[in-house]
Design a protein with these regions (language model features):
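Nucleotide-activated chemistry modules centered on ATP-dependent adenylation/adenylyltransferase
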Residues: 1-64, 80-264
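Hydrophobic positions on the alpha1 helix immediately C-terminal to the Walker A/P-loop
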Residues: 76-77
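Short, glycine-rich nucleotide/cofactor-binding loops
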Residues: 64-73
Length: 264
């Protein structure tokens, strides 16, 4: 898949129109480029201030939750947050049939960095029903989009729940620029989305094929008591300079993966 060489926007985004030089239509607009540069500067400043303020959060055993998939970006994020910012990191993995190489990377990195880890394994029966329904009721963009747009809110919401439960102020995701789709997130999930919206996909709630227990896998702040303290959900790579080759080199050099080809 082609991505814009400036902002890493995927070609699949409507209106991307990546030209022969590898630049998307949005970056070719001077006013858009200027606004994007201003936003990037603001995001970098916000991220630096936020990470430094989160260190040794009073009343919490951890300063941040990091969703950990076993891929290079989440592995390197663990290292940077711990080594560069001194944060107490809690790694979190939602295990939906992760491949063996991902688990190998996870175990290796956690041992190397000495980081605590929480794993959630949703019930097999629920996942079977969920994926069967999604594959039989695909949206126009196909199976990958159909599944990922439901799977992602499960693990994102679970990470938010974990942060709330443990009074952790930040969830920091290893999304690289262009991930997830910009329509879902650019640097930060909107605070109103975390504190005021039910994340249950309406078509799942309305189809009659899922029980209340099934739907409870999706995060909903509407069920939480008044006064709940909600975390911020940020994507640091959206603010930092990002170089995929450098990330692969670093995780290999640090021994977070066994070989560079494991850093997918």
């Amino acid at each position: 898949m082609k991505k814009c060489t400036r902002c890493l926007l995927p070609e699949t985004v409507p209106g991307a129109d990546i030209d022969a030089a590898g630049v998307c239509a949005f970056c070719r607009r001077p006013e858009t480029s200027s606004a994007a540069n201003a936003a990037a500067t603001a995001n970098r400043a916000d991220l630096e201030a936020t990470l430094r303020a989160a260190r040794n959060t009073p009343g919490a055993a951890y300063d941040c939750v990091v969703p950990l998939s076993g891929g290079k970006d989440s592995l390197y994020l663990l290292h940077r947050l711990q080594a560069d910012y001194g944060l107490r990191v809690l790694a979190f993995t939602c295990d939906i049939d992760l491949p063996p190489v991902a688990w190998s990377n996870i175990r290796r990195a956690l041992r190397k960095l000495d980081i605590d880890h929480v794993v959630l394994r949703p019930a097999h029966g629920f996942l079977t029903r969920l994926f069967r329904y999604l594959l039989c009721n695909q949206e126009e963009r196909g199976a990958v989009y159909t599944v990922s747009y439901v799977y992602a809110p499960i693990f994102e919401g679970a990470a938010i729940r974990l942060a709330i439960e443990k009074n952790i102020p930040l969830v920091l995701a290893g999304y690289s620029p262009g991930q997830p789709e910009p329509e879902r997130m650019l640097y930060e999930f909107a605070p109103a989305l975390i504190s005021g919206e039910d994340w249950t996909p309406p078509h799942l709630a309305e189809c009659g094929q899922f029980s209340a227990a099934d739907l409870a896998h999706f995060y909903s702040p509407l069920q939480l008591p008044a006064g709940t303290r909600f975390p911020r959900y940020l994507a640091p790579y959206h603010a930092w300079d990002y170089d995929q080759a450098e990330v692969i080199r670093k995780v290999t050099e640090l021994g977070l993966v066994q070989r560079s080809h494991h850093a997918n």
